[in-house]
Amino acid sequence: MSSLSAQKCEACHADAPKVSDEELAQLITKIPDWVPEVRDGIMQLERVYKFKNFKQAIAFTNKVGDMAEDEGHHPGLLTEWGKVTVTWWSHSIKGLHKNDFICAAKTDDVFNAL
């Protein structure tokens, strides 16, 4: 468990600050398998997880969904045969907040616990 995954998400409102470039550079080192991507002008975190079959992929998707509900922060999830793409960003600020890094680390913990 990383120090990020031990943290709890805080409520994020439209006036919450996005992570700075310096914070992004620091936080991304704690979740090295995640890739920062810009989509439609919005910075997001993305990772693809590989599985042996669809049953494992959907089970992982459901566990990530449970974690997201517990945190009150919800990712984009694309479940396909043998893989799940997870994308985190904060809709209210149209970018990345520390919550996204916390949840990315928690997603890694879900995967590592399988």
Swiss-Prot record:
Its EC number is 4.2.1.96. The keyword Lyase applies. InterPro entries: PCD_sf, Pterin-4-alpha-carb_dehyd, Pterin_deHydtase. One of its GO terms (molecular function) is 4-alpha-hydroxytetrahydrobiopterin dehydratase activity. It catalyses: (4aS,6R)-4a-hydroxy-L-erythro-5,6,7,8-tetrahydrobiopterin = (6R)-L-erythro-6,7-dihydrobiopterin + H2O. Keywords: Lyase. One of its GO terms (biological process) is tetrahydrobiopterin biosynthetic process. SUPFAM superfamilies: PCD-like (SSF55248). It is an enzyme of class 4 (lyase). Belongs to the pterin-4-alpha-carbinolamine dehydratase family. This is Putative pterin-4-alpha-carbinolamine dehydratase.
